[in-house]
Regions:
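Glycine-rich phosphate-binding loop of ATP-dependent small-molecule kinases
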Residues: 1-191
Length: 191
């Protein structure tokens, strides 16, 4: 599982993990971005939520993850990026994984010391990827929500599992991935 504020490099590293280890990258942000473009009531609701920079409600997020975990491609493992974001989601994920006879092997906490660095990265990504929903106001709101609701989950996982690994995410992509890979290879050796 990858945890950290938006713009900390989770998506980039998740793609590298997915490719290297042959496990699916489950990015809730991507799932929501796809769904909000659909001409449905749910799509319009998601678009409004996302454009405000708010978090999607726990119930909907849990249903999305539950349906995604049911696919057979997650049996060898998976990379969770952007979920859980609240304590209710973390507790629901624990229940879902227990029901599948699985657990979270490791939680990578992506750390970026400077909020301005995150804002700069996200604005650059918005321009490169044409993300109209990544306005400075929406980005600041999502960073605030991360600090309020999601950052405390790192302590939850540290206290309940002791498997949190801090990653200094301001380094070059290759250095960050080398550190992640070393940890993951160590886990595979213990299985």
């Amino acid at each position: 599982m990858l945890m950290g504020p938006q713009g900390s490099g989770k998506g980039t590293q998740a793609k590298l993990i997915s490719k290297t280890y042959g496990v699916p990258h489950i990015a809730t942000g991507d799932m929501i971005r796809e769904m909000k473009e659909l001409p449905t009531d749910l799509g319009r609701e998601l678009k409004d939520i996302y454009d405000r920079g708010d978090l999607v409600g726990d119930e909907l997020m849990i249903r999305l993850i539950d349906s995604r975990l049911d696919r057979g491609d997650t049996l060898p493992g998976l990379v969770l990026d952007g979920f859980p974001r609240t304590m209710a989601q973390a507790e629901a994920l624990d229940t879902l994984l227990r029901g599948l006879g699985r657990d979270i092997d490791v939680v990578f906490e992506f750390r970026v010391a400077d909020r301005d660095t995150l804002l700069e990265r996200m604005l650059k990504r918005a321009a490169e990827e044409g993300r109209s929903d990544d306005t400075p106001e929406a980005i600041r709101r999502r960073l605030d929500l991360y600090e309020e609701q999601t950052a405390p989950l790192v302590e939850y996982y540290r206290a309940t599992r002791g498997n949190v690994v801090g990653v200094h995410a301001e380094r070059p992509i290759e250095e960050v991935f080398a550190e992640i890979r070393e940890t993951l290879d160590g886990l595979e050796g213990r299985r």
